[in-house]
Amino acid sequence: MKRGSSLRGALVLGVALLVSACGVLEPRVPEARPEVPKQWPLPPTTEGASPVSPAPTAAPETQAVVDVGWRDFFVDPKLEELVARSLANNRDFRIAVLNVERARELYRIQRADRVPSVGAVGTMVRQGDGVPVTEAFSADVAVTGFELDLFGRVRSLSQSALQSYFAEEQARRSAQLSLIAEVANVYLTLAADQDQVRLARQTLSTREEAFRITQKRHEFGAVSALDVYQSRTQVETARADLARYEGQVAQDLNALTLLVGGTVEPALKPAGFDPNVTGLYALPPGLPSDVLQRRPDVLAAEHRLRAANANIGAARAAFFPSITLTGTVGVASDELSGLFDGGTGTWSFVPRINLPIFEGGRLRANLGAARADRDIALADYEGAIQRGFREVADTLALTSTLAAQRHALEQLVEAAGQAEEIARVRYEAGRDSYLTRLEAQRTLYVAEQTLITTRLAEQSNRITLYKVLGGGWTEGTR
């Protein structure tokens, strides 16, 4: 410990701290080459397909799907309430939110290494061994273990932590988007299965009445026993379907309860399947594939690539000398009352240089591992873009074909209903066999079931398109 001017010591320490520079060894982030077309293939045009109509508040010319809030996308108040509850209560989504908070705090820890750690220390020493007791007092302001970032190691580690934080934030957005889509799909599935229950119950009632009439006619010898048993098979088929769909409704409700994170009151259950439960902003012709860059999973992969690239800079910097500074500025005195008198100033300056000479290949292995991690992250980034392109292309391909299927099935149900009525009249008049009427009933019932399923698939595809284009991460304006 040297005594002298405290001002002189402060200047020496300050100059040493200002020496720190940022000579960065971090390489440039490699360019991703996912090799995807610049535009998605146009969906097939099918006769009878109707274009997807926008929501009432849509402004397709000025606003991209990715910017449409989920409250603007869904028009069913019940569904909006369930989505809001899921975002507040869902445990899996809560984990994603907490991961973001954790990554933010880790970044703050890493960032703190870029500035000196300053602390104040006060000491009193009293000693004596058969002689008069002596006392010594001191008060110091110390900078301990501050690394001069001459080659950017600390900066690279801080940048890596920052990019990891950004990646977690995008992962949270992706989790939110997936949760919203899943809640909407389960809600629609519940509504569709409820329609299937109503259809099966109505069909069962109709067939039971027809079975009773057939039994009466058999008692009078008007029909054979074969007609009776064929009628009974129709009854039991509808009864089995009713039980199956009631079970599916119960499972749908359980799934919705889990996603929402609480009880779903009867008032929030769908009254039935509403084809207008979602609105979708019309996509402009030739939508470019670079909108994938706004998908949260793609952005998360990009930030992970940048984090891995920054780690290469830190691994390279480890090959070079590192300088760590420890210094104090303070006062010392034999008497507490004179601690801050003139001439009591002290300072110390202890630089430490660490020069790696022999590490047994550890530093080179660390660099190789960092490069491998960067290459893995690059491949994952390119893969995320390719997966996103395929998801959007597949969903666009189904948009018009599902609309065409629904339109054809609506015509089929209408025609099958007329055919079933004619078959009933002709059978009761004795002009056709019961087998003809039976086939007409089956055709109508299957067509009605398939129409419900296709309507569900069409609406689910709309939700999927909204999701794969990156929409749903904002709440919206309504």
Predicted features along the sequence, with ranges:
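Strand-connecting loop/turn motifs
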Residues: 24, 115-117, 149, 251, ...
